[in-house]
Amino acid sequence: MIKKIILFFAVLIAIVIGQQPLNVVPYPQQVSIGTCVIPVAPGSILIESNIESATFSVSMDRYTNLFFPFSNESEPSSNESFLLSVTIYSDDETLQLGIDESYSLSIEQGSYQLKATNIYGAMRGLETFKQLIVYNELENSYSIVCVSISDSPRYPWRGFMVDSARHYIPKNMILHMIDSLGFSKFNTLHWHMVDAVAFPVESTTYPDLTKGAFSPSATFSHDDIQEVVAYAKTYGIRVIPEFDIPGHAAAWGIGYPELVATCPDYAANVNNIPLDISNPATFTFIQNLFTEIAPLFIDNYFHTGGDELVTGCWLEDPAIANWMTKMGFSTTDAFQYFENNLDVTMKSINRTKITWNDPIDYGVQLNPETLVQVWSSGSDLQGIVNSGYKALVSFAWYLDKQNPDNNIHYEWQDTWQDFYAADPTNNISTNAENIIGGEATMWAEQINQVNWDVRVWPRAIGIAERLWSAQSVNSVSLALPRIGHFTCDLSRRGIQSGPLFPDYCPMQDDLVFTMKPNTKLSKSEIKLILNK
């Protein structure tokens, strides 16, 4: 009883002095603290849902195994169990942009209630519930505070870009990445699959494409891709492929040299080589390839890159230059021609195109339905949303930069504060409603499975909260203790997320950091999840 009273007053004091009383990340929209603290014992919390779902069953099993990282054999065993009752109002498991991720969570003495419209809101609620379970190392005990939470994300698109082209990232490591993203309530994995240096995606239509991979073993099969998509679905994470064209296309030409431009003066930099858009066979190739690849993903969006096109290579290639002259094309016209043809392909495969902002910078008029990902600047973002395009913000969240622009921090991990301060609407005066979210990006020139965790976490936590929590939740000083607590929690879950300030994070004696997911899906589970 004394322990419960002390904890209750600690929470009360936090409220009085203006701190956020719950160590929950991202911070919920509405929180009401109750007047009780409930002791719980390892293994005592059971989850029961009112619907049958193979997808949600994976999530329930996952969190059941995560609730209690430490045993408390020193305390007397108790037969008392606590039932977390999950009520889901719809069995529709469609996972697309704009799904309802809201949930309500009520913890009272003798009653744990989680309610959501669908399984994806329930997944967000399970993560919050996990974070509410507090471990007291001195007492070797667990407790949970009585609380009422009503929560939903600020933005429907909360993405993270993984680059598995510049360094091959094994499938199991990508599944491990999905674990970390799901814990932080990201809901979109933007998979940058192909770039100038490598083409690691297997194609049954064009098998020589993987001649552009780093190694025959450094490739992704159709089965690999579908396992990633199914695993991500168990976290409510959409997976969107990116095939970056027309620039950054050199790897396409290793297996099929007729697809790319020839420009010796530019060839010293592999990033300079674009597709040959004067050859009609190029567009037939793209059409056939994307028709094969798109069904492996369940999302309605398909990212086609479009960044850093070196048009000088087109002008140096005699065949392309002659074609442009014949057509009366400037380089902007040629780029427009390519994007128009790409729109035809997107329509045929029933996908909505995403592109980086570069085509607009070149003067290309994109299809109004195109979603524009802005990596350049806030001023470009303002012009894009003023033109009526829906947009994603990324320019402020380049995690491969250990020292982001205007960094003033001594420790590079403190750059989470810069990411945290970068609200998508900063300096946006009009049409902010066209910003539907954003993405953190981790380009992989110097990143592979060995150092991915430590370069991403805990810095990406600030981005996760910025995209989920209310705009008014923006105090670095209030966020710091919560994020510090969560980074310790991530470490206990097998994510190598380091500290932000001097403290002590108790770890399990047998904790092993692996490049593997915390759950393994069987082939039958993958099929059930993808077909629901």
UniProtKB/Swiss-Prot annotation:
<feature type="glycosylation site" description="N-linked (GlcNAc...) asparagine">
    <location>
        <position position="427"/>
    </location>
</feature>
<feature type="signal peptide">
    <location>
        <begin position="1"/>
        <end position="18"/>
    </location>
</feature>
<dbReference type="GO" id="GO:0005975">
    <property type="term" value="P:carbohydrate metabolic process"/>
</dbReference>
<feature type="active site" description="Proton donor">
    <location>
        <position position="308"/>
    </location>
</feature>
<feature type="glycosylation site" description="N-linked (GlcNAc...) asparagine">
    <location>
        <position position="72"/>
    </location>
</feature>
<comment type="function">
    <text>Responsible for the degradation of GM2 gangliosides, and a variety of other molecules containing terminal N-acetyl hexosamines. This enzyme plays a role during the slug stage of development in the maintenance of pseudoplasmodia of normal size.</text>
</comment>
<keyword id="KW-0325">Glycoprotein</keyword>
<dbReference type="GO" id="GO:0030203">
    <property type="term" value="P:glycosaminoglycan metabolic process"/>
</dbReference>
<keyword id="KW-0378">Hydrolase</keyword>
<keyword id="KW-0326">Glycosidase</keyword>
<keyword id="KW-0732">Signal</keyword>
<comment type="similarity">
    <text>Belongs to the glycosyl hydrolase 20 family.</text>
</comment>
<dbReference type="InterPro" id="IPR015883">
    <property type="entry name" value="Glyco_hydro_20_cat"/>
</dbReference>
<dbReference type="Pfam" id="PF14845">
    <property type="entry name" value="Glycohydro_20b2"/>
</dbReference>
<keyword id="KW-0458">Lysosome</keyword>
<dbReference type="InterPro" id="IPR029018">
    <property type="entry name" value="Hex-like_dom2"/>
</dbReference>
<dbReference type="InterPro" id="IPR029019">
    <property type="entry name" value="HEX_eukaryotic_N"/>
</dbReference>
<dbReference type="GO" id="GO:0016020">
    <property type="term" value="C:membrane"/>
</dbReference>
<dbReference type="InterPro" id="IPR025705">
    <property type="entry name" value="Beta_hexosaminidase_sua/sub"/>
</dbReference>
<dbReference type="InterPro" id="IPR017853">
    <property type="entry name" value="Glycoside_hydrolase_SF"/>
</dbReference>
<protein>
    <recommendedName>
        <fullName>Beta-hexosaminidase subunit A1</fullName>
        <ecNumber>3.2.1.52</ecNumber>
    </recommendedName>
</protein>
<feature type="glycosylation site" description="N-linked (GlcNAc...) asparagine">
    <location>
        <position position="350"/>
    </location>
</feature>
<dbReference type="Pfam" id="PF00728">
    <property type="entry name" value="Glyco_hydro_20"/>
</dbReference>
<dbReference type="GO" id="GO:0006491">
    <property type="term" value="P:N-glycan processing"/>
</dbReference>
<comment type="subunit">
    <text>Dimer.</text>
</comment>
<dbReference type="GO" id="GO:0004563">
    <property type="term" value="F:beta-N-acetylhexosaminidase activity"/>
</dbReference>
<dbReference type="GO" id="GO:0005764">
    <property type="term" value="C:lysosome"/>
</dbReference>
<feature type="glycosylation site" description="N-linked (GlcNAc...) asparagine">
    <location>
        <position position="79"/>
    </location>
</feature>
